Swiss-Prot record:
Keywords: Cytoplasm, Glycolysis, Lyase, Magnesium, Metal-binding, Secreted. The keyword Secreted applies. It comes from Rubrobacter xylanophilus (strain DSM 9941 / JCM 11954 / NBRC 16129 / PRD-1). The gene is eno. This is Enolase. Pfam families: Enolase_C (PF00113), Enolase_N (PF03952). PROSITE patterns: ENOLASE (PS00164). GO terms for cellular component: cell surface; extracellular region; phosphopyruvate hydratase complex. Its cofactor is Mg(2+). It comes from the Bacteria. Mg(2+) binds at residues 242, 285, 312. GO terms for molecular function: magnesium ion binding; phosphopyruvate hydratase activity. Belongs to the enolase family.
Amino acid sequence: MTEIVAVRGREILDSRGNPTLEVEVVTAAGFVGRAAVPSGASTGQNEAVELRDGEGGRYGGKGVLRAVANVEGELAEAVVGMDVTDQRALDLAMIEADGTENKGRLGANAMLGVSLAAARAAAEYAGLPLYRYLGGPGAHVLPVPCANILNGGAHAANNVDFQEFMVVPVGFESYREALRAVAEIYAALKKLLAERGLAGGIGDEGGFAPDLSSNGEALGLLSEAVERSGYSLGEQVCFALDPAASEFYEGGRYELSGEGRSLERGEMVDYYVRLCGEYPIISIEDGLAEDDWEGWEMISARLGGRVQLVGDDLFVTNPKILRKGIERGIANSILVKVNQIGTLTETFETMDLAHKSGYTAMVSHRSGETDDTTIADLAVAVNAGQIKTGAPARGERVAKYNQLLRIEESLGEAAVYPGLGAFNPRMREG
Protein backbone atom coordinates (compact mmCIF):
# COMPACT_ATOMS: atom_id res chain seq x y z
CA MET A 1 0.00 0.00 0.00
CA THR A 2 2.83 2.41 0.75
CA GLU A 3 4.94 1.49 -2.27
CA ILE A 4 5.63 4.34 -4.68
CA VAL A 5 4.37 3.39 -8.14
CA ALA A 6 4.66 6.66 -10.07
CA VAL A 7 6.34 10.04 -9.97
CA ARG A 8 5.13 12.84 -12.24
CA GLY A 9 6.49 16.31 -12.84
CA ARG A 10 5.13 19.37 -14.58
CA GLU A 11 6.14 22.94 -15.31
CA ILE A 12 3.90 25.53 -13.63
CA LEU A 13 4.19 29.26 -12.92
CA ASP A 14 5.27 30.91 -9.69
CA SER A 15 4.14 34.24 -8.24
CA ARG A 16 6.56 36.20 -10.43
CA GLY A 17 5.33 34.56 -13.61
CA ASN A 18 8.44 32.40 -13.89
CA PRO A 19 8.33 28.64 -14.45
CA THR A 20 8.76 26.35 -11.48
CA LEU A 21 8.30 22.68 -10.79
CA GLU A 22 5.33 20.74 -9.45
CA VAL A 23 5.65 17.06 -8.57
CA GLU A 24 3.17 14.30 -7.78
CA VAL A 25 4.07 11.04 -6.02
CA VAL A 26 1.55 8.18 -6.30
CA THR A 27 1.40 5.08 -4.08
CA ALA A 28 0.11 1.59 -4.84
CA ALA A 29 -3.00 2.27 -2.75
CA GLY A 30 -3.77 5.38 -4.80
CA PHE A 31 -2.62 8.02 -2.33
CA VAL A 32 -1.23 11.09 -4.12
CA GLY A 33 1.03 13.78 -2.75
CA ARG A 34 1.58 17.02 -4.66
CA ALA A 35 4.16 19.73 -4.01
CA ALA A 36 5.37 22.87 -5.79
CA VAL A 37 8.90 24.22 -5.49
CA PRO A 38 9.65 27.90 -4.70
CA SER A 39 12.47 30.04 -6.11
CA GLY A 40 14.48 32.93 -4.68
CA ALA A 41 15.57 36.33 -6.04
CA SER A 42 18.51 37.00 -3.72
CA THR A 43 20.29 33.67 -3.43
CA GLY A 44 23.33 32.55 -1.47
CA GLN A 45 26.34 31.42 -3.47
CA ASN A 46 26.39 28.11 -1.57
CA GLU A 47 22.76 27.18 -2.17
CA ALA A 48 21.98 23.85 -3.79
CA VAL A 49 21.60 24.26 -7.55
CA GLU A 50 18.22 25.07 -9.05
CA LEU A 51 18.17 23.46 -12.49
CA ARG A 52 16.90 25.67 -15.30
CA ASP A 53 16.80 24.93 -19.02
CA GLY A 54 19.03 27.81 -20.05
CA GLU A 55 17.45 28.17 -23.48
CA GLY A 56 17.46 31.79 -24.59
CA GLY A 57 14.03 31.87 -26.19
CA ARG A 58 11.72 29.81 -24.02
CA TYR A 59 10.81 31.69 -20.80
CA GLY A 60 14.07 33.57 -21.25
CA GLY A 61 16.00 30.42 -20.34
CA LYS A 62 14.13 29.93 -17.06
CA GLY A 63 12.12 26.87 -18.08
CA VAL A 64 12.32 23.73 -15.94
CA LEU A 65 11.70 20.99 -18.49
CA ARG A 66 15.12 19.50 -17.75
CA ALA A 67 14.10 19.23 -14.11
CA VAL A 68 10.78 17.65 -15.13
CA ALA A 69 12.69 15.10 -17.20
CA ASN A 70 14.92 14.29 -14.23
CA VAL A 71 11.90 13.86 -11.96
CA GLU A 72 10.26 11.43 -14.34
CA GLY A 73 13.56 9.78 -15.28
CA GLU A 74 16.44 9.17 -12.90
CA LEU A 75 14.70 10.31 -9.73
CA ALA A 76 11.64 8.17 -10.46
CA GLU A 77 13.94 5.22 -11.08
CA ALA A 78 15.58 5.86 -7.71
CA VAL A 79 12.38 5.95 -5.63
CA VAL A 80 9.71 3.89 -7.43
CA GLY A 81 9.22 0.71 -5.43
CA MET A 82 10.33 2.34 -2.18
CA ASP A 83 8.16 2.83 0.92
CA VAL A 84 6.72 6.36 0.79
CA THR A 85 6.78 6.55 4.60
CA ASP A 86 10.56 6.09 4.74
CA GLN A 87 11.44 9.74 4.07
CA ARG A 88 15.11 9.44 4.95
CA ALA A 89 15.68 6.46 2.66
CA LEU A 90 13.91 8.23 -0.21
CA ASP A 91 15.94 11.38 0.18
CA LEU A 92 19.24 9.52 0.50
CA ALA A 93 18.41 7.51 -2.63
CA MET A 94 17.95 10.75 -4.58
CA ILE A 95 21.13 12.26 -3.16
CA GLU A 96 23.04 9.15 -4.22
CA ALA A 97 21.47 9.22 -7.68
CA ASP A 98 22.54 12.84 -8.16
CA GLY A 99 26.06 12.20 -6.93
CA THR A 100 27.14 15.84 -6.54
CA GLU A 101 27.78 18.01 -3.50
CA ASN A 102 25.39 20.76 -4.62
CA LYS A 103 22.73 18.65 -6.38
CA GLY A 104 23.76 20.30 -9.61
CA ARG A 105 23.37 17.27 -11.89
CA LEU A 106 19.70 16.45 -11.33
CA GLY A 107 18.71 19.74 -9.67
CA ALA A 108 17.77 20.60 -6.10
CA ASN A 109 14.38 21.78 -7.36
CA ALA A 110 13.70 18.35 -8.90
CA MET A 111 14.80 16.52 -5.75
CA LEU A 112 12.88 18.81 -3.42
CA GLY A 113 9.69 18.40 -5.41
CA VAL A 114 9.89 14.62 -5.03
CA SER A 115 10.87 14.87 -1.36
CA LEU A 116 7.95 17.13 -0.41
CA ALA A 117 5.40 15.30 -2.56
CA ALA A 118 6.41 12.00 -0.97
CA ALA A 119 5.85 13.45 2.50
CA ARG A 120 2.39 14.62 1.49
CA ALA A 121 1.52 11.21 0.03
CA ALA A 122 2.70 9.55 3.25
CA ALA A 123 0.56 11.91 5.33
CA GLU A 124 -2.44 11.07 3.16
CA TYR A 125 -1.79 7.37 3.73
CA ALA A 126 -1.51 7.93 7.48
CA GLY A 127 -4.72 9.96 7.51
CA LEU A 128 -2.96 12.83 9.25
CA PRO A 129 -2.48 16.53 8.50
CA LEU A 130 1.03 17.16 7.25
CA TYR A 131 2.19 18.99 10.38
CA ARG A 132 1.11 16.07 12.58
CA TYR A 133 2.64 13.46 10.29
CA LEU A 134 5.99 15.26 10.19
CA GLY A 135 6.06 16.45 13.79
CA GLY A 136 4.27 13.75 15.73
CA PRO A 137 2.14 14.36 18.82
CA GLY A 138 4.44 17.11 20.14
CA ALA A 139 3.75 19.54 17.27
CA HIS A 140 1.66 22.33 18.81
CA VAL A 141 3.52 25.67 18.58
CA LEU A 142 2.20 28.24 16.11
CA PRO A 143 4.90 30.44 14.57
CA VAL A 144 5.17 34.17 15.15
CA PRO A 145 4.80 35.77 11.69
CA CYS A 146 7.63 38.07 10.66
CA ALA A 147 5.64 39.95 8.05
CA ASN A 148 7.50 41.84 5.36
CA ILE A 149 5.24 44.83 4.74
CA LEU A 150 7.87 47.20 3.30
CA ASN A 151 10.04 45.87 0.47
CA GLY A 152 13.33 47.08 -0.94
CA GLY A 153 16.50 45.64 -2.44
CA ALA A 154 16.16 42.75 -4.88
CA HIS A 155 12.45 42.37 -4.04
CA ALA A 156 11.38 45.80 -5.29
CA ALA A 157 12.03 48.36 -8.01
CA ASN A 158 12.81 51.23 -5.64
CA ASN A 159 15.82 52.99 -4.09
CA VAL A 160 15.63 51.34 -0.65
CA ASP A 161 18.76 49.33 0.13
CA PHE A 162 17.45 46.91 2.75
CA GLN A 163 15.37 44.11 1.30
CA GLU A 164 12.77 43.56 4.00
CA PHE A 165 11.22 45.57 6.82
CA MET A 166 9.06 43.30 8.95
CA VAL A 167 6.52 43.76 11.72
CA VAL A 168 6.60 41.06 14.39
CA PRO A 169 3.48 40.67 16.59
CA VAL A 170 4.98 39.35 19.83
CA GLY A 171 2.49 40.56 22.43
CA PHE A 172 -0.58 38.46 21.64
CA GLU A 173 -2.25 35.39 23.11
CA SER A 174 -3.00 33.61 19.83
CA TYR A 175 -1.79 33.36 16.26
CA ARG A 176 -5.20 34.52 15.04
CA GLU A 177 -4.97 37.79 16.99
CA ALA A 178 -1.36 38.29 15.93
CA LEU A 179 -2.26 37.88 12.26
CA ARG A 180 -5.12 40.34 12.67
CA ALA A 181 -2.66 42.90 14.03
CA VAL A 182 -0.38 42.38 11.03
CA ALA A 183 -3.28 42.88 8.61
CA GLU A 184 -4.43 46.04 10.39
CA ILE A 185 -0.92 47.50 10.43
CA TYR A 186 -0.58 46.69 6.73
CA ALA A 187 -3.83 48.55 6.00
CA ALA A 188 -2.70 51.51 8.11
CA LEU A 189 0.61 51.64 6.25
CA LYS A 190 -1.20 51.66 2.91
CA LYS A 191 -3.27 54.64 4.01
CA LEU A 192 -0.22 56.41 5.45
CA LEU A 193 1.74 56.03 2.22
CA ALA A 194 -1.19 57.43 0.24
CA GLU A 195 -1.37 60.45 2.55
CA ARG A 196 2.34 61.09 2.02
CA GLY A 197 2.01 60.81 -1.75
CA LEU A 198 4.30 57.79 -1.82
CA ALA A 199 3.82 55.13 -4.48
CA GLY A 200 1.58 52.32 -3.30
CA GLY A 201 2.92 49.56 -5.53
CA ILE A 202 3.90 46.25 -3.99
CA GLY A 203 7.03 44.14 -4.22
CA ASP A 204 7.49 40.43 -4.85
CA GLU A 205 6.44 39.48 -1.33
CA GLY A 206 3.38 41.71 -1.03
CA GLY A 207 4.97 44.56 0.90
CA PHE A 208 4.77 48.14 -0.26
CA ALA A 209 7.73 49.44 -2.25
CA PRO A 210 7.92 53.25 -2.10
CA ASP A 211 10.99 55.35 -2.81
CA LEU A 212 12.33 56.58 0.53
CA SER A 213 15.27 58.68 1.64
CA SER A 214 16.72 56.09 4.02
CA ASN A 215 16.23 52.77 5.76
CA GLY A 216 15.49 54.78 8.88
CA GLU A 217 12.58 56.47 7.13
CA ALA A 218 11.14 53.01 6.38
CA LEU A 219 11.29 52.13 10.08
CA GLY A 220 9.71 55.46 10.95
CA LEU A 221 6.78 54.71 8.64
CA LEU A 222 6.34 51.28 10.22
CA SER A 223 6.36 52.88 13.67
CA GLU A 224 3.62 55.32 12.71
CA ALA A 225 1.54 52.55 11.10
CA VAL A 226 1.75 50.47 14.28
CA GLU A 227 0.69 53.40 16.45
CA ARG A 228 -2.17 54.35 14.12
CA SER A 229 -3.44 50.79 14.40
CA GLY A 230 -3.71 51.15 18.15
CA TYR A 231 -0.94 48.73 19.09
CA SER A 232 1.92 49.29 21.50
CA LEU A 233 5.26 49.58 19.73
CA GLY A 234 7.95 47.58 21.49
CA GLU A 235 5.47 45.62 23.59
CA GLN A 236 2.86 44.17 21.27
CA VAL A 237 4.71 44.75 18.00
CA CYS A 238 8.44 44.78 17.28
CA PHE A 239 10.47 44.94 14.07
CA ALA A 240 12.75 42.61 12.13
CA LEU A 241 15.09 43.44 9.25
CA ASP A 242 16.48 41.50 6.33
CA PRO A 243 19.03 43.82 4.72
CA ALA A 244 20.30 40.97 2.46
CA ALA A 245 23.70 42.65 2.74
CA SER A 246 25.41 40.41 0.18
CA GLU A 247 23.39 42.27 -2.45
CA PHE A 248 25.10 45.61 -1.68
CA TYR A 249 28.55 44.35 -0.62
CA GLU A 250 31.12 45.44 -3.19
CA GLY A 251 34.88 45.44 -2.93
CA GLY A 252 34.86 44.88 0.80
CA ARG A 253 32.46 47.76 1.51
CA TYR A 254 28.73 48.10 2.03
CA GLU A 255 27.32 50.41 -0.63
CA LEU A 256 24.08 51.97 0.61
CA SER A 257 23.35 53.65 -2.71
CA GLY A 258 19.86 54.74 -1.67
CA GLU A 259 21.43 56.81 1.12
CA GLY A 260 24.58 57.72 -0.81
CA ARG A 261 26.84 56.05 1.76
CA SER A 262 29.76 53.62 1.56
CA LEU A 263 30.58 51.83 4.81
CA GLU A 264 33.31 49.49 5.95
CA ARG A 265 32.23 46.50 8.05
CA GLY A 266 32.77 48.23 11.40
CA GLU A 267 30.72 51.22 10.28
CA MET A 268 27.99 48.89 9.04
CA VAL A 269 27.81 47.23 12.45
CA ASP A 270 27.70 50.69 14.08
CA TYR A 271 24.77 51.52 11.79
CA TYR A 272 22.82 48.49 13.02
CA VAL A 273 23.62 49.27 16.65
CA ARG A 274 22.24 52.77 16.15
CA LEU A 275 19.05 51.50 14.47
CA CYS A 276 18.50 48.99 17.29
CA GLY A 277 18.81 51.83 19.77
CA GLU A 278 16.19 53.91 17.97
CA TYR A 279 13.64 51.20 17.12
CA PRO A 280 12.43 47.94 18.75
CA ILE A 281 14.35 45.65 16.39
CA ILE A 282 14.50 42.09 17.70
CA SER A 283 15.88 40.28 14.64
CA ILE A 284 18.35 41.09 11.84
CA GLU A 285 18.82 38.63 8.99
CA ASP A 286 21.88 38.71 6.73
CA GLY A 287 23.08 41.98 8.22
CA LEU A 288 26.56 41.29 6.81
CA ALA A 289 27.59 39.67 3.53
CA GLU A 290 27.71 35.88 3.37
CA ASP A 291 31.49 35.84 2.85
CA ASP A 292 32.26 38.59 5.39
CA TRP A 293 32.76 36.26 8.35
CA GLU A 294 34.89 38.85 10.13
CA GLY A 295 31.97 41.25 9.95
CA TRP A 296 29.66 38.55 11.28
CA GLU A 297 31.97 38.04 14.24
CA MET A 298 31.83 41.78 14.93
CA ILE A 299 28.04 42.05 14.82
CA SER A 300 27.67 38.88 16.89
CA ALA A 301 29.92 40.37 19.57
CA ARG A 302 28.10 43.72 19.53
CA LEU A 303 24.46 42.65 19.20
CA GLY A 304 24.28 38.87 19.64
CA GLY A 305 23.36 39.15 23.31
CA ARG A 306 20.18 41.15 22.68
CA VAL A 307 19.16 40.78 19.03
CA GLN A 308 18.42 37.65 17.05
CA LEU A 309 21.02 37.47 14.25
CA VAL A 310 19.78 35.23 11.47
CA GLY A 311 21.96 33.58 8.85
CA ASP A 312 20.24 33.06 5.49
CA ASP A 313 22.74 33.51 2.64
CA LEU A 314 25.34 32.88 5.35
CA PHE A 315 24.19 29.32 6.18
CA VAL A 316 21.89 28.42 3.23
CA THR A 317 20.12 25.76 5.34
CA ASN A 318 23.31 23.68 5.11
CA PRO A 319 24.37 21.75 8.24
CA LYS A 320 28.05 21.77 7.27
CA ILE A 321 28.15 25.56 6.94
CA LEU A 322 26.01 26.03 10.05
CA ARG A 323 28.44 23.89 12.03
CA LYS A 324 31.31 26.18 11.01
CA GLY A 325 29.30 29.19 12.13
CA ILE A 326 28.55 27.60 15.48
CA GLU A 327 32.24 26.84 16.00
CA ARG A 328 33.13 30.48 15.31
CA GLY A 329 30.28 31.84 17.41
CA ILE A 330 28.64 33.83 14.64
CA ALA A 331 24.91 34.57 14.45
CA ASN A 332 22.46 32.90 16.82
CA SER A 333 19.71 31.83 14.44
CA ILE A 334 19.25 30.25 11.02
CA LEU A 335 16.73 30.91 8.28
CA VAL A 336 15.32 27.67 6.90
CA LYS A 337 14.44 27.50 3.21
CA VAL A 338 13.80 23.98 2.00
CA ASN A 339 14.96 24.70 -1.55
CA GLN A 340 18.38 25.89 -0.35
CA ILE A 341 19.32 22.33 0.61
CA GLY A 342 16.96 20.26 -1.54
CA THR A 343 15.45 17.53 0.67
CA LEU A 344 13.20 17.37 3.70
CA THR A 345 15.63 15.07 5.53
CA GLU A 346 18.52 17.53 5.25
CA THR A 347 16.22 20.37 6.30
CA PHE A 348 15.34 18.51 9.49
CA GLU A 349 19.01 17.71 10.14
CA THR A 350 19.93 21.39 9.87
CA MET A 351 17.14 22.49 12.19
CA ASP A 352 18.03 19.79 14.71
CA LEU A 353 21.65 20.95 14.73
CA ALA A 354 20.53 24.55 15.22
CA HIS A 355 18.27 23.74 18.15
CA LYS A 356 20.84 21.53 19.87
CA SER A 357 23.37 24.36 19.54
CA GLY A 358 21.10 27.01 21.05
CA TYR A 359 20.27 28.63 17.71
CA THR A 360 16.69 29.43 16.79
CA ALA A 361 15.23 28.63 13.37
CA MET A 362 12.91 30.75 11.26
CA VAL A 363 11.06 28.88 8.51
CA SER A 364 10.87 30.93 5.33
CA HIS A 365 9.22 31.25 1.95
CA ARG A 366 11.01 32.51 -1.18
CA SER A 367 10.19 35.59 -3.24
CA GLY A 368 9.02 33.34 -6.10
CA GLU A 369 6.24 31.32 -4.44
CA THR A 370 3.18 29.22 -5.25
CA ASP A 371 0.03 28.39 -3.33
CA ASP A 372 1.80 25.38 -1.79
CA THR A 373 1.47 25.57 2.01
CA THR A 374 4.10 23.03 3.07
CA ILE A 375 6.22 25.54 5.00
CA ALA A 376 3.27 26.43 7.25
CA ASP A 377 2.95 22.78 8.28
CA LEU A 378 6.73 22.47 8.58
CA ALA A 379 6.93 25.41 10.98
CA VAL A 380 4.39 23.79 13.30
CA ALA A 381 5.82 20.29 12.86
CA VAL A 382 9.17 21.32 14.33
CA ASN A 383 7.76 23.91 16.77
CA ALA A 384 10.02 26.49 15.11
CA GLY A 385 8.07 29.36 16.61
CA GLN A 386 8.86 31.74 13.74
CA ILE A 387 7.83 32.00 10.10
CA LYS A 388 8.56 34.48 7.35
CA THR A 389 6.11 34.37 4.49
CA GLY A 390 5.59 37.92 3.29
CA ALA A 391 2.86 40.50 3.70
CA PRO A 392 -0.79 39.65 4.38
CA ALA A 393 -1.42 40.20 0.67
CA ARG A 394 -1.01 38.23 -2.59
CA GLY A 395 -2.57 34.79 -2.72
CA GLU A 396 0.65 32.81 -2.49
CA ARG A 397 1.55 34.56 0.80
CA VAL A 398 -1.94 34.51 2.31
CA ALA A 399 -2.22 30.77 1.56
CA LYS A 400 0.42 30.07 4.22
CA TYR A 401 -1.13 32.42 6.77
CA ASN A 402 -4.56 30.87 6.24
CA GLN A 403 -3.18 27.35 6.59
CA LEU A 404 -1.77 28.34 9.97
CA LEU A 405 -5.23 29.60 11.00
CA ARG A 406 -6.62 26.17 10.15
CA ILE A 407 -3.86 24.42 12.07
CA GLU A 408 -4.43 26.60 15.14
CA GLU A 409 -8.13 25.80 14.97
CA SER A 410 -7.47 22.06 14.68
CA LEU A 411 -5.11 22.13 17.68
CA GLY A 412 -7.70 23.82 19.86
CA GLU A 413 -6.57 24.39 23.44
CA ALA A 414 -3.29 22.60 22.75
CA ALA A 415 -2.16 25.43 20.45
CA VAL A 416 0.60 27.65 21.83
CA TYR A 417 1.51 31.09 20.50
CA PRO A 418 5.01 31.84 21.87
CA GLY A 419 5.33 35.55 21.16
CA LEU A 420 8.72 36.93 22.16
CA GLY A 421 9.58 33.56 23.68
CA ALA A 422 10.17 32.20 20.16
CA PHE A 423 13.18 34.42 19.64
CA ASN A 424 16.69 33.56 20.61
CA PRO A 425 16.97 32.72 24.34
CA ARG A 426 20.44 34.22 24.57
CA MET A 427 18.97 37.47 23.29
CA ARG A 428 16.44 37.57 26.14
CA GLU A 429 19.03 36.63 28.75
CA GLY A 430 21.42 39.36 27.61
